[in-house]
Each structure stands twice: as structure tokens, then as C-alpha cells.
Curated annotation (Swiss-Prot):
This is ATP synthase subunit alpha. CDD domains: ATP-synt_F1_alpha_C (cd18113), ATP-synt_F1_alpha_N (cd18116), F1-ATPase_alpha_CD (cd01132). Belongs to the ATPase alpha/beta chains family. Keywords: ATP synthesis, ATP-binding, Cell inner membrane, Cell membrane, CF(1), Hydrogen ion transport, Ion transport, Membrane, Nucleotide-binding, Translocase, Transport. GO terms for molecular function: ADP binding; ATP binding; proton-transporting ATP synthase activity, rotational mechanism. One of its GO terms (cellular component) is proton-transporting ATP synthase complex.
Length: 513
């Protein structure tokens, strides 16, 4: 075969023109050491704090320590395949997670990857996990309620949309139960929920997900799970990932509720990461910025005004405020609320629900200590009917606890004191509530009205809860119009109050209590 010289030159030219000679300029470094999910990397001269790094095997890490001659990075996920001498690349990006309604009903890990075996999540948007909280001008005061469906909380420690309310107590006092009941009660109320499980057993998280599915709550809930078997870095970042998913709804004029269960384990994970990065330890071996760890997370829970939402959505959503309500959980050791992390979170939040082991063991569940549980802003958000009726309950309980302690030493009591003690016993019994059975507003209103107006005084303490259930059934079947009016208006007019009194008296005549 004979080739023409001109053809050869044309062939060479066409081959040369087809070559891609674009050089990719990337900042690279070398792994010096890898221990317990922490990598020391030499090089990476242009790396930024919090930047994502690309390791071999499609693994990513986060640059946390920027030192003179090396970078300390945490590996997100498996790190066993990374070895000394491997090449690490800068990505120029910070950590992002998928956000949007596509995540509802799913269980994801810290990076937003599905772990429930239901296939991929086709989220159209992603967002950074570390964001600056809305400023003072962008916020609006808390004025709408988040109904938890728990009598003792809605009556005495009300929570508003955009509030941060701490749930604090020893292990096995029902902290998760309060949070899960609150999520179940949001059904049909237009509140999206995010449940962040940090450092819990996988079996415990699976049980929570099963309960949410049974009550139809997974339709509006995202579960972010960083189990005890996940790395410390994944546990520390899970709360921020969940917060970003919740902010998606807040910034678009929707209402969201996020539960961090629990921030004690997040602080432990952060302490572990910090000590492995050789940061100097402080009180209780926590690093110096452990307060900032929680404050920058909880400040992102807020109620934002209409202007903020309109500006964020470029005018697509107008006339709507958005909110993200946070229920952080803190586990105490032997009731010690003066430890480092509990005091930090108490000072950051807008109130706390304190759960006590003694009350829990005495069968008073939810085991809420009414004396030291407070809500600093929720009173403004309480529904009118509950606000009218709940004033007496807290006073009754406080006086009852005081008198009960005093009555142990007194042999003869006057009638007024005895009456006060009897009323207190009945109110304490009335505030007991089984798990996964949240109440609607009208049910709570009927129970409080009956307690305040002496309808329970002649009922045996052991019959209080059956009496309450019977009363609710009676109202629902025979006085449906009254029930609907209270539920719709969230108020109790004089006519409705008279009708409610007549309905309770009607029930008293027919019931065998």
C-alpha cells in the first residue's frame, strides 16, 4: 500500500487537533498518617477551613485543622483503604447535603444518602450544612403554637413555632418519647418534621421509624441517622445536616420541627474528633469551642418574617412567614444539670422541659417536673382556650407539691389544706398520658375545664383517666358541634363554656363515677 506524503501530514494534523491538551490545575497533597478516621496530609497549600477533600476510592473528608506544614482532616465514612502516601485533592467545595420534599418519608445518613433500602433519592437541590443564622431584622416574634398533644407540655410549658425548647433528663426518663409524640401530633397541621438520631443504637432508631410509620407520621418526616457504629465525624455533623434539611422548609415560608436526639452524644463525638486532631482540651476534656458548637446550630432555629421569605424565594412566595422549631435533647448524669454541656444548652435555648427519674418511677409519665420546667417565649404562642384554662393547673400543682412535702410531718390538716391536696392528686393523675396517644386541642380543653371547675373532686384518683376518656367519647358522640367549634376557633366563648359545662354535667349524670 502506497501513502501519499500529503495524506500523512493531514492525518497527523487531524490527530493533533483531536487531542485535548487542557491541563487540570488542582491543589494536591500526600497522606502522612491515618488513625481513627483522622488523616494528616502534607501539601494542600491552598486548602480552606471546612473544605471537602477527595481521597482515593471515591471517599471524601473535611479539612478541620490548618497547620504550618500539614492539614488535619476527618474522613467521612470508611477509611480502612486509605494508606500513607495516597494522593489527596482539594475540591474547592464545602460539604453539601440534598434538600427538598423528595427526602420526606426516608431515612438518610449524615451525607443525605438513603439507608432504608428504598432506592435512590432524586433530590433536585443541595445546600451547605454550615450556614449563618438569620439576623435580628429577618426574624419575627414567636406567636403561633406547636401543639405537642401532651397535656402537661401544652398546658404548662407551651412551645411556639420558631422556639428552641430543651428536653433534658437522665437516661430512661422518656425524652425520646416526648419528642416522638410531638412529631406524631403534627399530622395534618402542615408542619414538616426532621428527626436527627445521634449516636443511638441502630435497633433503637429502627424502632422509632417503625412507630412513626405505624402512626402515618413518616409522610411528613425525614430521619437523619448517625448510629453508634458510625464514625465520630459523621455523628458530629449529623445535626447540621438535619438542620439544613429543615431550613429548606423554613426559608420557603413553611413550618418545620427538628428534634436533635441527642446533643450530649454530639458533644462527645466532637470532643473525640478534637482530641484526635490534638486540639487543647478544656473543662471535662471538651475543646474550647463546644459552646459555639451548639449555639451556631440552635440559633438557626427561628421564625423568619415575610420579607425574608419573599427575598429568599425571589418573590415566588409572598405573605408567608417561615419557622424552624428545635427540640434539642440533653442526657444528664444522675440529674446533674450543672455539668458543662447541660448548662451551655440551657443558656442557649428558650426554655427547658425537665424530666425526672423519681417521677418516672412513680408512674407519672411524661415525668415532667412542673416546678423547674419553663417556656420563655411559648406563652405568647399558646392557643386562647388553653391559655384561659391552664393558669390554674400550674398553681394547683406547685401548691400541691409544697403541701405534700409539708403534710408528711403534720398529723391533723384543716379542710382547706386537705381539699388542696385532693385537688393536687387529681391534677397529677390527670396529666398522666400513655405514649403515642397525643390529644387534640378540644380534648385538652375539656380535661382542663373539668379539673378547674371541680368536676373531678368527687371522682376517685384511680378513676380519673377512665373518667377523662369517657368524657372525651361522650363529647365526640353527643356534642360534635361544640367539639368542632372549639377545635376550629381554638377559643372558648361564653356560650361554648356554658355548653361545655352542661355537657360535662350531662356526662356526670350518665356515668358511674
Amino acid at each position: 500500500m502506497q501513502l501519499n506524503p500529503s495524506e500523512i501530514s493531514e492525518l497527523i494534523k487531524s490527530r493533533i487537533s483531536g487531542l485535548g491538551a487542557d491541563a487540570e490545575v488542582r491543589n494536591t497533597g500526600t497522606v502522612i498518617s491515618v488513625t481513627d478516621g483522622i488523616c494528616r496530609v502534607h501539601g494542600l497549600s491552598g486548602v480552606m477551613q471546612g473544605e471537602m477533600l477527595e481521597f482515593p476510592g471515591n471517599t471524601y473528608g473535611l479539612a478541620l485543622n490548618l497547620e504550618r506544614d500539614s492539614v488535619g482532616a476527618v474522613v467521612l465514612g470508611e477509611y480502612e483503604h486509605i494508606s500513607e502516601g495516597d494522593t489527596v485533592k482539594c475540591t474547592g467545595r464545602i460539604l453539601e447535603v440534598p434538600v427538598g420534599k423528595e427526602l420526606l418519608g426516608r431515612v438518610v445518613n449524615t451525607l443525605g444518602q438513603p439507608i432504608d433500602g428504598k432506592g435512590p433519592i432524586n433530590a433536585k437541590e443541595t445546600d451547605v450544612i454550615e450556614k449563618v443564622a438569620p439576623g435580628v431584622i429577618a426574624r419575627q416574634s414567636v406567636s403561633q403554637p406547636v401543639q405537642t398533644g401532651l397535656k402537661s407540655i401544652d398546658a404548662m410549658v407551651p412551645i411556639g413555632r420558631g422556639q428552641r425548647e430543651l428536653i433534658i433528663g437522665d437516661r430512661q426518663t422518656g425524652k425520646t418519647a416526648v419528642a416522638v409524640d410531638s412529631i406524631i401530633n403534627q399530622k395534618g397541621k402542615g408542619v414538616f418534621c426532621v428527626y436527627v438520631a445521634i449516636g443511638q443504637k441502630a435497633s433503637t432508631i429502627s424502632n422509632v421509624v417503625r412507630k412513626l410509620e405505624e402512626h402515618g407520621a413518616m409522610e411528613y418526616t425525614i430521619v437523619v441517622a448517625a448510629t453508634a457504629s458510625d464514625s465520630a465525624a459523621m455523628q458530629y455533623l449529623a445535626a447540621y445536616a438535619g438542620c439544613t434539611m429543615g431550613e429548606y422548609f423554613r426559608d420557603r415560608g413553611e413550618d418545620a420541627l427538628i428534634v436533635y436526639d441527642d446533643l450530649t452524644k454530639q458533644a462527645w463525638a466532637y470532643r473525640q474528633v478534637s482530641l484526635l486532631l490534638r486540639r487543647p482540651p478544656g473543662r471535662e476534656a471538651y475543646p474550647g469551642d463546644v459552646f459555639y458548637l451548639h449555639s451556631r446550630l440552635l440559633e438557626r432555629a427561628a421564625r423568619v418574617n415575610e420579607d425574608y421569605v419573599a427575598k429568599f424565594t425571589n418573590g415566588a412566595v409572598t405573605g408567608k412567614t417561615g419557622s424552624l422549631t428545635a427540640l434539642p435533647v440533653i442526657e444528664t448524669q444522675a440529674g446533674d444539670v450543672s455539668a458543662f454541656v447541660p448548662t451551655n444548652v440551657i443558656s442557649i435555648t428558650d426554655g427547658q422541659i425537665f424530666l425526672e427519674t423519681d417521677l418516672f418511677n412513680a408512674g407519672i409519665r411524661p415525668a415532667i417536673n412542673a416546678g423547674i420546667s419553663v417556656s420563655r417565649v411559648g406563652g405568647a404562642a399558646q392557643t386562647k382556650v388553653i391559655k384561659k384554662l391552664s393558669g390554674g393547673i400550674r398553681t394547683d400543682l406547685a401548691q400541691y407539691r409544697e403541701l405534700a412535702a409539708f403534710a408528711q410531718f403534720a398529723s391533723d390538716l384543716d379542710d382547706a389544706t386537705r381539699k388542696q391536696l385532693e385537688r393536687g392528686r387529681r391534677v397529677t393523675e390527670l396529666l398522666k398520658q400513655p405514649q403515642y396517644q397525643p390529644l387534640q386541642v378540644w380534648q385538652l380543653a375539656a380535661s382542663l375545664y373539668a379539673a378547674n371547675n371541680g368536676f373531678l373532686d368527687n371522682v376517685d384518683v384511680k378513676d380519673i383517666l377512665p373518667f377523662e376518656k369517657g368524657l372525651h367519647d361522650h363529647l365526640k358522640t353527643k356534642f360534635a358541634d361544640l367539639v368542632n367549634r372549639i377545635e376550629d376557633t381554638k377559643d372558648l366563648s361564653k356560650e361554648d363554656e356554658a355548653a361545655l359545662r352542661a355537657a360535662i354535667e350531662d356526662f356526670r349524670k350518665s356515668a358511674a363515677f
